[in-house]
Amino acid sequence: MEEVGIPSIETWTEAQRALLRQLILRGQQTIAELARDQAVSVPFITKALNELIASGWVCEVGRKENYARRAPRLYFLNAKRAYFLGIDMGHLWMSLCICDLCGTIIYAHSRMAFY
């Protein structure tokens, strides 16, 4: 079920998809790092990033450390935006796991299956 006012994944631009892939693969990044790795301008990345922030998929997570000047902001996936459920039904055992968007395990359980 889609939330009101939040675009579905199918309507995302290629830039938004590329940003999410980059954040998944590389972790927390600044706008400058995102722009450099995508080989596009900072304003282009800023626009796509702001759209993802507005829809709740990305959030600011702090500032980069060890900077002589003003430290740039770091962005990462909003872990609470989506959850995944994995179920493994074996012949004798059943296991399930729930994790957030960042891969942190929220719940895991295994037990012997009933016949």
Where do the protein language model's features map onto the residues?
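N-terminal phosphate-binding loop and adjacent alpha-helix
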Residues: A108-Y115
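Extreme N-terminal segment that seeds HTH/winged-HTH DNA-binding domains in transcriptional regulators
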Residues: M1-D37
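A short, conserved structural fragment
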Residues: G56-V61
